[in-house]
Structures are given as structure tokens and as C-alpha cells.
Design a protein with these regions (language model features):
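A conserved mid-protein helix/loop that constitutes part of the nucleotide-sugar donor-binding site
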Residues: 1-16, 29-32, 116
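Short alpha-helical donor nucleotide-sugar binding micro-motif in glycosyltransferases
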Residues: 58-63, 118
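Aromatic "clamp/platform" in nucleotide-sugar-dependent glycosyltransferases that forms part
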Residues: 71-72
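Short hydrophobic beta-strand element within catalytic cores of glycosyltransferases
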Residues: 88-91
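Conserved acidic donor-binding segment of nucleotide-sugar-dependent glycosyltransferases
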Residues: 103-104, 108-115, 124-129
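A short, well-ordered alpha-helix in the C-terminal region of glycosyltransferases
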Residues: 117, 124, 131-145, 155-158
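C-terminal alpha-helical cap of glycosyltransferases
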Residues: 145, 149-172
Length: 172
């Protein structure tokens, strides 16, 4: 529930931003606790589960901004997918989210439980198309440079080499 209940700040955001459409993708055990609070807004649209990869790719191609509203998250792949689709990202600053993007460069990290921060950051992007494009391009580069299989393999080998040296030093 901790992950999903952060969505309950969205009514304040949607109420203050009636001209902005919000799409919720996904499903889960807490849908029945969240949907009633959101469905009363004309600018809210629940899409449910999308088939991977085609429907997910289509969704990312049609949105202007990707927002991850979460109370807790370790390392959500959706941030990387949004980056690869050159979308500016807004995400709650919890868990490992800050490791998937760079605040102010590839994303805006939002304070937990702060509807005003969401409103300000969404407005900042919607009112500055150049910033949206710049953030999307930076996100794409950041994902390519830091999350490619080659980079992951190099990092893993480096960890193994470091630990191998540490183990050798303990034996001596």
C-alpha cells in the first residue's frame, strides 16, 4: 500500500490543473482504493494494463511528460523506458528512483506527499517546451550511457575484480 497510496495526492493536482490530462497505466491490488478518488475528474484516464512492448511504446510516444507517482520504489524500469523515448520525467523522490535519473537534468524529483511540488514541476515543463525537449534528450543520453548492457557488464566486471583483489589481500 505504501507504494500506491502516494497516488492519493493526485486529486489536488488534477483539481488545480483541469486542462492537463493524466493517464494512469497499470493495475494492482489497491486499484479499488485509488480509482474512486481519481475517476471523478474529467482529466483523469485509467488505461489499465498495457501489453509490452507494443502498447507501452505507443503510450510513451503519445505522452508529453512521464510521471511516476510512488510512495516507494527500488529501481523502476519505466523511468529508463521513458528516457529512451526522450520523455521528460517527473518522479517522487523515494527509494532508488534518484539513481535512475538526474534531478534538474533528466528529470524533476518531487518531494513525497507534496502536491504543490507536482503542480509547480508540471507547470514548469508545460510552459517551457524547450526545457521539455532538453530534458528528454538528456534523459535519452543518460540512459544510453549508464544503463546499456555494455556499461552494466563493465561495472559488474569491475566489482568482481575489486572483490577478487580484496579476497587476495586477505589471504596474504
Amino acid at each position: 500500500w505504501e507504494k500506491a497510496k502516494e497516488m492519493l495526492i493526485l486529486p489536488k493536482v488534477m483539481e488545480k490543473m483541469p486542462d492537463v490530462n493524466f493517464y494512469w497505466v497499470g493495475d494492482g491490488p489497491y486499484r479499488d482504493k485509488i480509482l474512486p478518488a481519481l475517476e471523478k475528474f474529467d482529466n483523469f484516464h485509467w488505461l489499465g494494463h498495457l501489453k509490452y512492448p507494443d502498447e507501452v511504446r505507443q503510450f510513451f510516444s503519445e505522452i508529453d511528460i512521464y510521471a511516476l507517482v510512488s510512495g516507494i520504489d527500488m529501481s523502476p524500469h519505466t523511468l529508463l523506458e521513458a528516457g529512451l523515448m526522450k520523455k521528460p520525467i517527473l518522479a517522487t523522490n523515494v527509494g532508488g528512483i534518484s539513481e535512475s535519473c538526474k534531478d534538474g537534468e533528466t528529470c524533476f524529483l518531487i518531494k513525497k506527499n507534496d502536491s504543490d511540488d507536482w503542480i509547480n514541476k508540471i507547470s514548469t515543463l508545460l510552459n517551457n517546451k524547450a526545457k521539455m525537449k532538453e530534458m528528454g534528450e538528456s534523459g535519452y543520453s543518460y540512459v544510453k550511457e549508464n544503463f546499456s548492457w555494455d556499461k552494466i557488464a563493465d561495472d559488474f566486471i569491475s566489482i568482481l575484480e575489486t572483490n577478487s583483489k580484496l579476497a587476495s589481500n586477505k589471504k596474504n
